[in-house]
Amino acid sequence: MTDKIDYTKKPLTLAEQVARLKQRGLVFDDESEATAYLFNISYYRLRAYTYPFQENGEDSEHTFTRKDIHFKDIIDLYCFDRRLRSLIFNTIEKIEVAVRTKIVQVYAESTGDSHWFNDESLYRFGYDDLMDRIDADVNRSNEDFIKHYNSKYDNPSMPPSWMALEVVSFATLSRLFQSLRLDSRKEYITEQFGLKKVAILENWLHSISNLRNCCAHHSRVWNRRFMVSVILPYNTLYPFMDRTTIGQIRTNKLFAVLSCIAYILDIISPGSDFKKNIKELLKSDCRLLDLKDMGFPGNLSPFAGKIANFVFIQSDQQIVNLSVPVILDSSSYRVCYFNC
């Protein structure tokens, strides 16, 4: 292991930040405008958007690898990513609410227990850690219904499931579902999201939760490699993707997670504008945008401005827009996402 050293870099003025970027090869059309952007967005945040276009070796000067990149191009890419994050974040809310509702309803109804989530026998692992997470999330909440419960009741100390699980984070909710023992209730919830295997839904919720957190904390998502790779199933209750399509997808990139989100939305929110809005966003005239950076299959990249539909089912005879889930013979149809 390399020995650690002292951090000796000094802060830069805004003018010095512009000069640094110019020295490295970034083109500025209006330095005063660029200075204003840097004062609002920050040099360090924009670094995530310049990094892919710079030499970044250990002893590198971080020179731009292309001589035609303007500061405006970096801002355009940043703004595209910001709009993308906003769209994704607002969309995930629907999935998050649906997951909360189904878990609470199914387990509360089947157990007849308002506080079923406290029952250790329901879990296969991680009970103590999960209870600590739920307790922390509930105690952190400022919701009036939590305050009302705490002011009126002293036993149980935790509010009922429909209150407590309403305020826990999506990450905690995902962890709860993963920790629950495999039984018919868990399988039933999985089927409500169009999936046949519980492990797939567990993976999807984990992946979507991670993406949600990136959006919530204003982290870039456009070219991110996610820590959790998405499992893309060959066999689902409704049309998804065929084996050939799945084999072309990088499962740790954004495209894979968006495909899962789109599939779930077609089930829980038919007629959602998500696919339409993604299609419009991908028409961006951002010069640095390359769909391959988002994990799109490479042959789609040249058509960034010509996306016809987010999801379609293609056969030899016809193309059918998929606005609601339908069961089709998978032998005669091929399901693709973001195709042209």
List where the protein language model places each region.
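Acidic, Ala/Val/Gly-enriched low-complexity intrinsically disordered segments
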Residues: 316, 320, 324-329, 335
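Long, contiguous internal "core" modules enriched in hydrophobic/ aromatic residues
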Residues: 2-316
